[in-house]
């Protein structure tokens, strides 16, 4: 596998330099049941968000993160903040999937590579070398799960430049249209 910094298509990716999970506040301006709000949309807006600061200084946010994954990411980050060399032990002897992956493979990097527009979900790829296999493989994963594995393995995380640019354009367009504001 290529050098950590020099993987194929590195120029098409921005490295994540800082990361923080944001948890929703239980108070909101929408009623819990509203005829204008689709229940699946309501479910998504009450889920955590991962906010990533990228190497170019921009911010990339990814919503709809499962609560348990966001909490596990937060625990890994908090443990590292206290002591970078502290093992990420848990009182529970059972392994989570993210822990099992790093036990069975050398994780090189996680990359958020694409979006599936009809579902409005991102796709990630996890580059790793399974123990005893020697040959690199790439797994497509749910991005939040790939990020968790990368954090546990101290591997780098990247986001596709095209995804970041599309998100910026969408944000600019929403500002122009005063998205979310009501006329008074």
What annotation goes with each model-predicted range?
Residues 2-184:
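Divalent-cation
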């Amino acid at each position: 596998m290529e050098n950590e910094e020099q993987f194929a298509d590195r120029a098409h990716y921005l490295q994540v330099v800082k990361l923080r999970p944001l948890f929703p506040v239980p108070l909101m301006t929408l009623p819990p049941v509203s005829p204008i709000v689709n229940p699946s949309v309501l479910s998504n807006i009450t889920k955590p968000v991962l906010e990533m600061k990228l190497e170019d200084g921009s911010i990339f946010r990814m919503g709809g993160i499962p609560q348990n994954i966001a909490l596990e990411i937060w625990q890994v980050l908090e443990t590292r903040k206290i002591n970078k060399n502290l093992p990420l032990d848990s009182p529970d002897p059972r392994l989570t999937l993210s822990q099992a992956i790093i036990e069975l493979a050398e994780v090189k990097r996680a990359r958020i590579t694409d979006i599936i527009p009809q579902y409005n979900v991102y796709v990630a790829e996890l580059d790793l070398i399974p123990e005893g296999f020697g040959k690199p493989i790439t797994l497509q994963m749910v991005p939040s799960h790939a990020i968790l594995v990368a954090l546990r393995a101290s591997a780098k995380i990247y986001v596709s430049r095209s995804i970041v640019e599309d998100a910026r354009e969408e944000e600019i367009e929403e500002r122009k249209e005063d998205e979310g504001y009501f006329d008074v």
